[in-house]
Amino acid sequence: MRVLGIETSCDETAAAIVERDDMGEGRILSNLVLSQIAEHEPYGGVVPEIAARAHVEALDRLVDRALNDAGLKLYEVDAVAATAGPGLIGGLIVGLMTAKALAMAAQKPFYAVNHLEGHALTARLTDGLPFPYLLLLVSGGHTQMVLVRGIGDYERLGTTIDDALGEAFDKTAKLLGLPYPGGPAVERMALQGDQKRFALPRPLKGEARLNFSFSGLKTAVRQTATELVPLTDQDVTDICASFQAAVADTLSDRVGRSLERFKTEFPDCATPSLVVAGGVAANKTLRAALENLCTRHGFAFIAPPLNLCTDNAAMIAWAGAERAATQAPDSLDIAPRSRWPLDEKSAPVFGTGRRGAKA
């Protein structure tokens, strides 16, 4: 089965063609992503209206290129899949309506994909990973630990109770006068800094619950920087290094408890695995900390290639293909959802929930 996938949930316009054979193995035939960093950089973050307009301008051409790169015509794909949520509603509408129109024109089945499910299933495309496994999703809009039991069968073990980790990186970078996007900028500066100079907090470390919290850490960074004004270059690098070390310690503690939970629930699992996805997964320091953690706990550490960790359409096409193998297509009446948890039957997280551009 060959599926055309479309992703427009935030600030990347993406189109891809993925093939899934009868044995469940996948192959990427094309995968194109057009970033909007240049459009949003002057504002220090994603502007929803600008993002939606950029999707409108780019998507049709990108779909044509994806088909051409795969050597296919639209009528030769077997299904069309698009992100229907969660994300920025304007961008979701652009991608969803385009995908519906293509599916209708080509008389192909349509699948509305949860963006988070795309991340959750990527390791099955890249590594052929069997169920069950753990997923750590760390991005600008989400920080979640998810137990992946099967297609459509997910349990959220922990999530952020305030800020997503990617947002904490971006806000720290903006506070220190570093360029957008903030994650890579903080990582570069941290390489030159002293991570022991500032004693920043490790939120929720040692607690039994599996949730995350980064608001207090972000506030501590602001207070530290304010006390040092005017900041020297060394101050900035040391703050970045101390911040990154605090994040690594926090993740190791939170994820370590989730690994123990997994082993308790699946004691006979022959290949326990931790999958890490999302833009923050590109951070080498955090990856190294998580790899060491997995080694100590006897888990395989799996991080898809960087271009498949960040937002892309190959994961959406693959999620559509996985669902098509066992489920009926979705109605063309389905609406986009700015909020769409993977585990809809679970109790809501305490508080008002995530807010902001990538919530």
Curated annotation (Swiss-Prot):
It catalyses: L-threonylcarbamoyladenylate + adenosine(37) in tRNA = N(6)-L-threonylcarbamoyladenosine(37) in tRNA + AMP + H(+). Its cofactor is Fe(2+). Residues 328-359 are annotated as: Disordered. Its EC number is 2.3.1.234. Binds 1 Fe(2+) ion per subunit. Keywords: Acyltransferase, Cytoplasm, Iron, Metal-binding, Transferase, tRNA processing. GO terms for cellular component: cytoplasm. GO terms for biological process: tRNA threonylcarbamoyladenosine modification. Substrate binds at L137, V138, S139, G140, G141, D170, G183, N283. It is found in: Cytoplasm. It holds the Pfam family TsaD. InterPro entries: ATPase_NBD (IPR043129), Gcp-like_dom (IPR000905), KAE1/TsaD (IPR017861), TsaD (IPR022450). Required for the formation of a threonylcarbamoyl group on adenosine at position 37 (t(6)A37) in tRNAs that read codons beginning with adenine. Is involved in the transfer of the threonylcarbamoyl moiety of threonylcarbamoyl-AMP (TC-AMP) to the N6 group of A37, together with TsaE and TsaB. TsaD likely plays a direct catalytic role in this reaction. Belongs to the KAE1 / TsaD family. This is tRNA N6-adenosine threonylcarbamoyltransferase. The gene is tsaD.
